[in-house]
Amino acid sequence: MVKLANPLYTEWILEAIKKVKKQKQRPSEERICNAVSSSHGLDRKTVLEQLELSVKDGTILKVSNKGLNSYKDPDNPGRIALPKPRNHGKLDNKQNVDWNKLIKRAVEGLAESGGSTLKSIERFLKGQKDVSALFGGSAASGFHQQLRLAIKRAIGHGRLLKDGPLYRLNTKATNVDGKESCESLSCLPPVSLLPHEKDKPVAEPIPICSFCLGTKEQNREKKPEELISCADCGNSGHPSCLKFSPELTVRVKALRWQCIECKTCSSCRDQGKNADNMLFCDSCDRGFHMECCDPPLTRMPKGMWICQICRPRKKGRKLLQKKAAQIKRRYTNPIGRPKNRLKKQNTVSKGPFSKVRTGPGRGRKRKITLSSQSASSSSEEGYLERIDGLDFCRDSNVSLKFNKKTKGLIDGLTKFFTPSPDGRKARGEVVDYSEQYRIRKRGNRKSSTSDWPTDNQDGWDGKQENEERLFGSQEIMTEKDMELFRDIQEQALQKVGVTGPPDPQVRCPSVIEFGKYEIHTWYSSPYPQEYSRLPKLYLCEFCLKYMKSRTILQQHMKKCGWFHPPANEIYRKNNISVFEVDGNVSTIYCQNLCLLAKLFLDHKTLYYDVEPFLFYVLTQNDVKGCHLVGYFSKEKHCQQKYNVSCIMILPQYQRKGYGRFLIDFSYLLSKREGQAGSPEKPLSDLGRLSYMAYWKSVILECLYHQNDKQISIKKLSKLTGICPQDITSTLHHLRMLDFRSDQFVIIRREKLIQDHMAKLQLNLRPVDVDPECLRWTPVIVSNSVVSEEEEEEAEEGENEEPQCQERELEISVGKSVSHENKEQDSYSVESEKKPEVMAPVSSTRLSKQVLPHDSLPANSQPSRRGRWGRKNRKTQERFGDKDSKLLLEETSSAPQEQYGECGEKSEATQEQYTESEEQLVASEEQPSQDGKPDLPKRRLSEGVEPWRGQLKKSPEALKCRLTEGSERLPRRYSEGDRAVLRGFSESSEEEEEPESPRSSSPPILTKPTLKRKKPFLHRRRRVRKRKHHNSSVVTETISETTEVLDEPFEDSDSERPMPRLEPTFEIDEEEEEEDENELFPREYFRRLSSQDVLRCQSSSKRKSKDEEEDEESDDADDTPILKPVSLLRKRDVKNSPLEPDTSTPLKKKKGWPKGKSRKPIHWKKRPGRKPGFKLSREIMPVSTQACVIEPIVSIPKAGRKPKIQESEETVEPKEDMPLPEERKEEEEMQAEAEEAEEGEEEDAASSEVPAASPADSSNSPETETKEPEVEEEEEKPRVSEEQRQSEEEQQELEEPEPEEEEDAAAETAQNDDHDADDEDDGHLESTKKKELEEQPTREDVKEEPGVQESFLDANMQKSREKIKDKEETELDSEEEQPSHDTSVVSEQMAGSEDDHEEDSHTKEELIELKEEEEIPHSELDLETVQAVQSLTQEESSEHEGAYQDCEETLAACQTLQSYTQADEDPQMSMVEDCHASEHNSPISSVQSHPSQSVRSVSSPNVPALESGYTQISPEQGSLSAPSMQNMETSPMMDVPSVSDHSQQVVDSGFSDLGSIESTTENYENPSSYDSTMGGSICGNSSSQSSCSYGGLSSSSSLTQSSCVVTQQMASMGSSCSMMQQSSVQPAANCSIKSPQSCVVERPPSNQQQQPPPPPPQQPQPPPPQPQPAPQPPPPQQQPQQQPQPQPQQPPPPPPPQQQPPLSQCSMNNSFTPAPMIMEIPESGSTGNISIYERIPGDFGAGSYSQPSATFSLAKLQQLTNTIMDPHAMPYSHSPAVTSYATSVSLSNTGLAQLAPSHPLAGTPQAQATMTPPPNLASTTMNLTSPLLQCNMSATNIGIPHTQRLQGQMPVKGHISIRSKSAPLPSAAAHQQQLYGRSPSAVAMQAGPRALAVQRGMNMGVNLMPTPAYNVNSMNMNTLNAMNSYRMTQPMMNSSYHSNPAYMNQTAQYPMQMQMGMMGSQAYTQQPMQPNPHGNMMYTGPSHHSYMNAAGVPKQSLNGPYMRR
């Protein structure tokens, strides 16, 4: 037949049709024309003609469909024709091929045990001659497709079994699920009715088949067949019509059958839904929705399906696995095939290929993975490939694939998104398929895959083929395949720039291209693996996106619209800008920034969870944009007040001053926030270098510009924004801290300063921070206390010179004047000075209105208001605490600046002023207690409300004060100074005035606002008291020659008259109360942080008490008698500012009637508040003063302070003095020469002002005797025991005389502690004391609460002080006995023979000191106390001198010493670790923080007291009190680091300090820190049992270094002899001189204690060890001791005592602190509150009281504190301490913590005090609760605790008021004895910080919620303080360690935060403490983790605690 068309054209057209069809398009005329014309150039007309002709010819088929014409090749008609070509001749044959036989032959021939892969079968068959003959002509894909189809059918029919990619014959005659054969059903279990089917009715059957209409007689085949009828509708059918098999028919007849219309799902029994998705079981014909199947099905299964009901169990399981394998295969298969190819390469090149695979492989795989599954692989083919390998369930290959997988799995998301390990394995296997197959098949497979992947199994098969090939026939993988694979892999790698598999040792990436720089990286960074494996990464320098190649980068740069960081620019000067990037807003940017930073940072843990952080990005700007130079990150709500968590400068910008710029900028922000800041500890090596250089330069420049005689660490902290711990460590590093005559003094090394300034002038800094260019508002207004303080410091710095002059004048005047005059002078001078300072500050503040400093000016205004509007103030405060604060800050900015000048000048004045303020606060605080509503506000202005309360409560005192101080007040007020001074005094003088009532930390912690708000009274009072303490500690600015400056110790007398603060306090308290009412409207107080208020109040109260004491002392001491240094300090503080007003001593008395306690007796008696606390507060300032100024210039003259003043001062010194005593003791060591000169005087003063401070007591038996008249009665029993222990230990520790004083301080502190304890035990006694001392104490307490209320501390202090006063009066014997015992033991343990001597010598002193300390507690800033104590402890170690300067100094020094000792003086380090043992410094730290700290650091009294008490009466009551004091003291560390930013940071800084000075030691050597924290604490506890003093000292040191918990724990430990032992052991470890040594020693300790979950018992044994260990621990103790002994030869002996126990019980010690905490709660809710109140008051208000400025932090911290220790809550320190013992902190900060500590280190103690013993550690939670309960009950914690709580309730009420939920926590916590105190603490802490209340309330619940911060606060504090230590050791953690989630863990979430903040710390700690921690806790790193993880667990723990 002739063809019409041209055959050539027809051929062309057929080609075109094929081509079009190949493109999956319909061969239309248009497409055919286009194809032919493009190929052959034929025109369209011709093509259409030829096409028409060809159709006529029949050579082309024309198909019309819906009006569209298509053309086909009749020989190859698409799908139908596809087989034709192959089959053409063979198709028929092929169709005749028995595929089942072929497959069987292949599988049998391959004979592979696991089964054969599709590939293997295909290759095998292709090798068969008959098959190759059949299919030789057909395309490979045709054979492959048919084989796959046949295999699928075989599987469906059960002939083949498929296992992953492997196929094997079904030997059981296809009884696969799928087989329809009878066998398969017959092997199924018999069917039975389901429960829901049995009861249902059956419809009447219709006897006709619905299909064939036949009956049972005749079916379709005309044969009889039974009908099956539907049970629902009755419709019937023949089984044959239904196509049922006989087996199925039999089974169905036994069931309730449903027809297809009625079928319901047997699982969900829902007929209506998803009928299309219903499967019918081949065994019972029931219906199931696919989603209702078990496991749920995503696709209709092929072949036979048996439901889960009929499926045999085993088979069911297999089915499940099979389904899982299928699903995995589905995931991996689509990707699997392509991936398989890639995988082959991958498997071959296990190294880089995974990446390569992801790169080149992905594309191919995508093509291959046409199946739906391939979609997932396309983007993540690399991942998926790996996954594929895992996905396949080949048993033999799983491990193989797994390994391959893991290598490739490291892509960023792979590990997270791989469906399952199996899936990944399968892919790995797939990868193994021969490369050739992969590569070759890519093209093929793509098509084939596209063909078969439509079927799920196809996808699997594809993979199977690859896998089969890989696994089934590996012989098939030829050498050629391998070579091909390698070749391709190399090519792929070259494209990406990867030369070979990455070397794990090599940094990846080793180079980055960043902007115009190519930077060699220093470390590896966790970039996603595909990036991190590349040798070079390309980063966009603006958005920081990372890319693989320069091309991608260039393309990105064209599109990237960024030219600066995605945030607001907050600073610009010249070409330098800083942007504040919020991690929550610009998450990706911040993550990329962290990844970039890690390339240049050794260890960094934060990469992806950047939300809680702010990133301050420094850029250098040019026309192109803002080029990244570096950045620092800070946590948004850091409890530790860390202002930097990570800092990095890119290498190309290094050594150009940018690092310093960023550090300076971070401190500028901290100052704007109104709080002292500190970098997160532990610091890295480079970080420590950078920071130490910065601190040195800043401090030297500050000293250069500050010519004050009295410069305190607190003041320095305010001026610089650097936390006291860091300052202390730096001063120590510069050798500018010395311990003289029982106090730490700052030595001005003029040559050093001048040299530095000369260098600076030669080499000007290239870039400097210009505060004027900062446009930034703090996220949170920090607690007013610290922030304002810091700002005040800055203001002071600006106006310090004028102030100094004024101060000097005032001091000189005040020296001559009586105490009242001194106090007035303090007020007036301080006011005057402060106004000057404040004025400059005001301008600064105006610029930084947001800053707390701004608040200060505002405060000054309110203070005026407060004067006239006390009530007004209160009301306002309630409403507008925050607003008022802010308003005040803004409004008073100018006045504040004036004040700032004055304030700076008259640090002493300020301190005195602070005292007055404290008095005011105290007076106000009682009302505040009454008016709990104020408490939350007080948080904002912590000092304000307490002041208000004090004003209300002791209007008379206030009036008197105001009257007295009115002279000054008029001046000050006229200058506007007074308000400012108060604020300033609070801020700066709190540090300086550890002794001044300021010890109610509010002044310091209180942001300047507080001080200003109630500047007169608060400040004056604080100033006076502080100043006295400061005078003793800091008043002395010893020139380099150590010559005493104008305010020598001898001048202490003059200075004593100077305690104008005290006289002012009494007179001014009432006066100021009036003034506060008038001058400080409520708003003012509101603005003042609660701590400030508390401080002010407590300081007022204390002042009143101190004034009384002073008056008594003055009566006795009118002649120049050496009053205890703390007294001297107090007086110095009081006097120096008050000197001009010295003539108004009566006023002071008048202001503070002896019968009337300024502070609530509770406050007075609050152990935490006791001397240690006040000392803490004042001591820091004192140390600063003494250091900058002279040792306590004011030699307490007999007539220096009236007895009231003395008693107040005694109380203050007690509270202040414990630190002052610590300082004093250390200073006495240092100033021993001076004391030799002034010794007589000071002794006289001491005796005259017996309770003035432990040191006072030691120095002046006369003074002490006087106070002891009251106090001794109650204290004598205690003192007897304490002193016995004290004396014994002192004899042991007799070498260091300062330690004796410290012992005295410890005793005093312990008395205070005991007061706290007795608040539980002797609440009745406390009541008596309250009655006896109620008026003075109330006023005192009022003062103190004012100060401390700012942090719950005020409240606690108040009640504590009241209790203290009462207890001191009545219970002093009892309380002091336990407290003293504890203190003595602690102190002795912390040990210094001096302490012992002092203890014996100071027994009376202790009594007096106790009273005095009680007040001082309030007045002392816990932080100051801590810092001083740390210093004291460390210095005590070094020379019991240098650091006793201030608590802050001590704490800082202590921490520093950990560092310094390790770095400079290993022994010192140990000393720091062993502080308590050496100086009682540790105890001091621990006890001193509350009151113990003072004693332990300054005087054996405190440690002896606490320690002695602990030893003497294991009853937890006393221990509780000491513990509490410890907590307070420790809280000073922890809480202060949280609350008291200056001090708190110091505390945290302690840890930080440790990390600063011996970051390596403390942080890197967790054991050192641990020892310090846990060791010291534990050691403390341990020591307390064997060496009460040493243990406590150690604990103090630890606590200071580590945390409140430690101290509390130590205190607890001391309380419990077992605990003491535990405590001692860690102390020994702690005593290790260098962190490393500490670590070394500590590891055992830690090990001991890490086992303590079980080893809580171990700790028990270790505690016993500690007892024997006193000598065995010397190894550890020796290290500690060595640093101590070498630094302080006398202290060493105590350290040995303490240390051996510590050493043995290093871990136990760590935990002992927790028990101490428990004991603290035991000691009494009031006691605890007192401690914490004081701590907050002292620390929070005084040093770091920043409730408002760091409102969130403070609040959180407070919450933490509240949770941690209801009593110590005011500061977050206690909580911080209990941070680790979060559960403790939760339930009862003290209690819970004690319990955890107890369990671990204090288990013995716990046992001693209660049944829950060793297991406590493991069951820390349980322990906490039982322990707490037991302890409480043992220590009167139960009912007495409740009583105390009741006693403290006012304070709590205060706090409650301050913290809205405080009262609730109080109540809630109170429900349980354990938590009873906690609530107090909570309430109190809440007061300072609103959060605290809630937290206390929820102890367990809120803990986590608020605790996030609270816990953080606590934990962070703990971490801070114990950063390396605590985390490592986590006394708490270890103890909590067995706790469900780490008792700490409640705080743990915060801890996590803390970890974040503290991340580096924890990190360093981990390195430092891995051994100890690893042993003790889980591991050092674990600690870190635990800290982080603890958050949640802690919550759990806390919850349990709460429940308990």
From Swiss-Prot:
Sites annotated Breakpoint for translocation to form KAT6A-EP300 and KAT6A-NCOA2: D1117, D1118
UniProt effect for mutating H732D: Reduced affinity for DNA
Principal location listed in the UniProt entry: nucleus
Outcome of substituting K545A: Reduced affinity for DNA
Renumbered residue ranges of the record's region Interaction with RUNX1-1: 312-664
Pfam family, one: zf-MYST
Interaction with RUNX1-2, as annotated region: 1517-1642
Residue stretches of biased makeup (Pro residues): 1650-1699
Enzyme class: transferase
Cross-link (Glycyl lysine isopeptide (Lys-Gly) (interchain with G-Cter in SUMO2)): K834, K1342
Coiled coil: none
GO BP terms: cellular senescence; chromosome organization; myeloid cell differentiation; negative regulation of DNA-templated transcription; nucleosome assembly; positive regulation of DNA-templated transcription; positive regulation of gene expression; protein acetylation
Ranges annotated as biased composition (Basic and acidic residues): 817-836, 874-888, 931-942, 953-980, 1203-1223, 1275-1287, 1323-1345, 1358-1367, 1398-1420
Residues where N6-acetyllysine is found: K172, K350, K355, K604, K815, K1007
First and last residues of each zinc finger (PHD-type): 206-265, 259-313
A GO molecular-function descriptor: histone H4K5 acetyltransferase activity
Region (Required for activation of RUNX1-2): 1913-1948
Entry function: Histone acetyltransferase that acetylates lysine residues in histone H3 and histone H4 (in vitro). Component of the MOZ/MORF complex which has a histone H3 acetyltransferase activity. May act as a transcriptional coactivator for RUNX1 and RUNX2. Acetylates p53/TP53 at 'Lys-120' and 'Lys-382' and controls its transcriptional activity via association with PML.
Domain notes: The N-terminus is involved in transcriptional activation while the C-terminus is involved in transcriptional repression.
Family stated for the protein in its record: Belongs to the MYST (SAS/MOZ) family.
Protein name: Histone acetyltransferase KAT6A
Organism expressing this protein natively: Homo sapiens
